[in-house]
Amino acid sequence: MSGTIENPYENFIALSRYARWLEKENRRETWQETVDRYFDFMLNHLDKNLNYKPDSKLVEELKQNVFFRNVMPSMRAVMTAGAALERDHVAGYNCSFIPVDNVRSFDETMYILMCGTGVGFSVEYKYVNKLPAVPETIEKTSTIVVVEDSKQGWARAYRELLSLLWAGQIPAIDVSKLRPAGARLKTMGGRSSGPQPLINLFDFTIKVFKNAVGRQLKPIECHDIMCKIGEVVVVGGVRRSAMISLSNINDIEMAAAKHGNWWEQNPQRSLSNNSVAYSRKPDMAQFIAEWKSLYDSKSGERGIYNVAARSEEHTSELQSHSCISYAVFCLKKK
């Protein structure tokens, strides 16, 4: 079929990750149709909101370069251009960052991930220590959290659960309004995972809180909750979440998060790449110990991220997002 990518692997990625389903034609878009959809959306956006129409020759030149992958726009925007991106601009961003320093960090992460945007997060002590303590007792109540069938509905329900847990209450969860697994998602594309991943997240979160009664959540517990949130974002059996977690150099539990057979006891940890965040130059003993920990883990984690170096470029408190991954210390030969 014309408009496809010659390289079969690249074409598979384009079809499986970015092409929308054409209901009337009972097929997926070709790569050319995906590129056209993206440009149609952006040109309409510029015209409607800024009263700007780029030169047609420039548009055609840009289209050709995107088609041949010489330059690429935000791939999240390529995936969502149309009704999904029109509904929520968050769906147009590749990456984001959030410190886990507020009870809202968790449900906001869920919403951002469900929009298709990657999330970098930090469970450094300076952030996690701002969270409220878990009550001395947590008991079941007659309160019912009703989950609405939308991204906002899922995030809102999770926010309600967390608020109740921090108030010492375990509510009942009503997921009767959610569409079944396999149902087509017409706006975002793909198919629904059904209510089970959300139920699993709620159960997991309740368990973590029960184990933390009378104290604040630890960084590793916040990390695990964030990773479990990432598990929810599965569309048609395909993982759609990208995450990276930053932690302190002296956080031994985070350093060992992917040591041993971690995937058996904590499979949710596969959802995030982990890096230690250096805010100042460590002494040689610390540095060597971190590299030895990385080697001993057999997973290549934690990675090493120099926050101070980034601070020279950006004066804000924001740190990193899911795209830094292991480009931090992987060199690509040309």
Model region roles, listed by residue range:
Residues E317-K334:
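Positively charged, low-complexity/disordered segments
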Residues M1-E312, S316:
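Extended catalytic cores of very large enzyme megasubunits
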